[in-house]
Amino acid sequence: MFVIKRNGYKENVMFDKITSRIRKLCYGLNTDHIDPIKIAMKVIQGIYNGVTTVELDTLAAEIAATCTTQHPDYAILAARIAVSNLHKETKKLFSEVMEDLFNYVNPKNGKHSPIISSITMDIVNKYKDKLNSVIIYERDFSYNYFGFKTLEKSYLLKINNKIVERPQHMLMRVAVGIHQWDIDSAIETYNLLSEKWFTHASPTLFNAGTSRHQMSSCFLLNMIDDSIEGIYDTLKRCALISKMAGGIGLSISNIRASGSYISGTNGISNGIIPMLRVYNNTARYIDQGGNKRPGVMAIYLEPWHSDIMAFLDLKKNTGNEEHRTRDLFIALWIPDLFMKRVKDDGEWSLMCPDECPGLDNVWGDEFERLYTLYERERRYKSIIKARVVWKAIIESQIETGTPFILYKDACNKKSNQQNLGTIKCSNLCTEIIQYADANEVAVCNLASVALNMFVIDGRFDFLKLKDVVKVIVRNLNKIIDINYYPIPEAEISNKRHRPIGIGVQGLADAFILLNYPFDSLEAQDLNKKIFETIYYGALEASCELAEKEGPYDTYVGSYASNGILQYDLWNVVPSDLWNWEPLKDKIRTYGLRNSLLVAPMPTASTAQILGNNESVEPYTSNIYTRRVLSGEFQVVNPHLLRVLTERKLWNDEIKNRIMADGGSIQNTNLPEDIKRVYKTIWEIPQKTIIKMAADRGAFIDQSQSMNIHIADPSYSKLTSMHFYGWSLGLKTGMYYLRTKPASAPIQFTLDKDKIKPLVVCDSEICTSCSG
């Protein structure tokens, strides 16, 4: 039996050669648990005559990946095999790869179709010796298999459907794409990215340095006008943004309700639902960058709109398909008055924005005055109990996980953009709170800090965190200036207000590395100090940029220009970790370069790449299946697996017990100290999660994507959670509602014979959303 080598030659299959290749990649791994011979034997079983060495490597990597539940080092081995395979298939020198990407010719029409921009190519040509010399390819081998496969599927650039970039090439392309001729800053960014201190957002990783360098993640739009022209002009904006991989949040509260008179045609409006069907079909039609990200929009509506009940049914599984928009996400922009009416079991008036104009343009006391004026004037379409609407909201959330909940008054009251006008919606993932109007489309560029990296020698390094955050601020400011904007209204907005969004990933990993239970007082204190540090570092860097380049255009009149920072708006006194008064004085003198700075986002894909838990979330499970575009992988909490193997507690019985319990270790006989640290989200009181969100909220000047997890949700449980979050002053009350099914699915690779029959399993292996 023979294999076909990369050079096309045939060679007889040799078991020892396969074993030797795998063994070479086992350096630094736990040899007590990693068995190259076992992997090689399974590879041999999959061989056929004429198999290629590329296929052999792919098979070996997949086999190693399936052994991850035995030891986390198998995930590293799997990645090393896959990375080594890629290295053998790609050129080494960064400059040569960039040259190939620039010189690409479309084989179908013979036209020169450069994948990277001419300026990127010019920079690389000028500094190629320096750039080539600083790249450290060994860092490619630090990715786990799951992270590498995510990169391979969607992030590494291809020519004729063949990957030509290595991960280090991608990171250097991103660094050069951001900093351009500032090579020293590009190298600094490259090193921080490749050492995994932080990551830029997916659109930046996709597009930096390319011919279409659209690096922004989030776009927020208001409906231009309640007219055919306004509706379709807005739709065109959405299409152009979605085409370039932007996620969209759209406010439609100014669109007239069904049954309303249309003076221009002497007709009657069909309301928002038929319009949203058109938007839904646009989202389905547009494919972002070759299946990298599907076209996605979140639609925001205020609950006084008289189409609210039909809106809440849009994503339900049953009912008339003509009244469903399954490809849109729905979100509510809730004024405090509605929450008060629900709390008091009061009545709620449903109105049409054409007959009751201006409600979407005001908030707080001004909204309450206008709304109650329209009530007194009987301009409403109908009156129902506020709790009838509330019940419909809860029922929709239990069935579909949506609508998202954001509190209009908190979002406006605590925004440093309050001086611009009323903010009418958030974005697709509920963490961006920015002003938009008919002439401006709000934009945000994102990056996230890998918090696990800052746990050094058993302590959290706040100074290093501040330094990395300052680099991120400088990077995101450069992106604002050089970005390719899909529509001019986005460029106008972004360059006037210069908002950025710094988030985090690996908060749960940092707690675990410090041996803090997620709901412990130590974790709650660290949670506050981390975000205090991020906010402080971001403000300091933004002020330093303002000293050099001037404040952003609309700085005057903002809270910050009057010496008021985010924590002041929450009536919170910061800790003594940082010296805030001198920073406030400096801001008064020089201003800020950015209107907004901090916005913890979901980080779904980038956390997968870096091997961290998502955003600020606890682990949803200790063993589960991950599903992404590249396939399905079984993942074990590597921290738990490492501690159990070190303490000689890991065995098949424990593995199967945990899998039978849906990833929980609470029903095992493991030591209590381990059980406390490795609680899943389902075992942590949701009020603790909400309280921690409010604690860090004082240092988050945008908002945060916060999911609510309730295994068995009910009207009373959800109502309690929502009102608790509202009472604490949260801006985002809920991103998704995550629940568990009534009965468990068949467990993945479960050996039932090795489970003691004392517990009946009724849990699922939970997967987090890819927001």
Curated annotation (Swiss-Prot):
Keywords: Allosteric enzyme, ATP-binding, Deoxyribonucleotide synthesis, Early protein, Magnesium, Nucleotide-binding, Oxidoreductase. Its cofactor is Mg(2+). This is Ribonucleoside-diphosphate reductase large subunit. Interacts with RNR2/OPG047 subunit. Maximal ribonucleotide reductase activity requires the presence of Mg(2+) ions. Induction: Expressed early in the viral replicative cycle. Residues 1-92 form the ATP-cone domain. Belongs to the ribonucleoside diphosphate reductase large chain family. ATP binds at K5, R6, E11, N12, V13, M14, F15, D16, K17, T53, D57, K88. Its EC number is 1.17.4.1. Ribonucleoside-diphosphate reductase holoenzyme provides the precursors necessary for viral DNA synthesis. Allows virus growth in non-dividing cells. Catalyzes the biosynthesis of deoxyribonucleotides from the corresponding ribonucleotides. GO terms for biological process: deoxyribonucleotide biosynthetic process. PANTHER family: RIBONUCLEOSIDE-DIPHOSPHATE REDUCTASE LARGE CHAIN (PTHR11573), RIBONUCLEOSIDE-DIPHOSPHATE REDUCTASE LARGE SUBUNIT (PTHR11573:SF6). It is an enzyme of class 1 (oxidoreductase). DTTP binds at D226, S227, I228, K243, R256. GDP binds at S202, S217, N427, E431, T603, A604, S605, T606.
